Amino acid sequence: MPLARSFLYVPANRDKFLDKALGLPADAFIFDLEDSVPPAEKANARAGVRAYAPKMSGERVWVRVNGLDTGLAEADLDAVIGVAGIVGLFLPKVETRDEVLRWDGMIGALERQRGLTPGAIKLVLSIESARGVLNAYDMSVAAARVVSLSFGGAQDGDLNTDLGCVWSIDGPEMLHARSHTLLAARAARFDTPLDGVFADVRDAEGFERDTALSRRLGYRGRKLIHPSQIEPCNRLYRPSEAELDYYARVLEAFDRAVAQGSASTTVDGRMIDVAMANAARRVLDAAAAWKKAG
């Protein structure tokens, strides 16, 4: 999956928003054909994807298609598979391994018809129901083109409603589902598990607090619904200078200890062994990749 932290939803039927997206600093964009597009506008949204995806630089465009049960999925796939600039698809409300296999078969057939490399179109599975949470790992490993999970825990969203819980800003009622989705993604060896949207675009402080928690849990990016969320999202999913300094000192101290015949040492009073050194290396490697990506 291409390196990304911020995934901004853009209704694909709104040329004004698509034009604006061309100049925004989000790492990736989700051109939406689903919930943000009214039924009468679905055809216009597909046309918007075809017109604007090729204009985006880099591997930045994903498309959220309509579900298999809507009668719209086939037309969505026919419209977008093979369009230049599209990395892959966000699949909404998936609940079972069989659904993933159906999507995989439909996409694979279109790839063959259109001369694409098998598996070229990647998939992110949106976890938006209790059943989806429980089946998250099995769905993750159902097809090689699945590259990440996306948690759908927005206030009054599908998962919130399915669980029957009362959403709060601190989020304890959603924490189990949020953590289970993260666990399934990591067990499937996905590098970039994605957290859900924060729906109150007026609450900048709440967004930052929730995104900081998201990163502590292990998520590496999230879906966004407003351009104002891009900068704090990119900043908060990036290691801080203090973290980078600490992990650089960890590696330096550990390498020095190994050279002296020891497999452990201490930094700032904390014991450091090979596991901690490997963790430090992962953080520093990720930071270097972000710096290279700009």
Show which residues each predicted segment covers:
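Expand to "…catalyze enediolate/carbanion chemistry for C-C bond making/breaking, isomerization
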Residues: 1-294
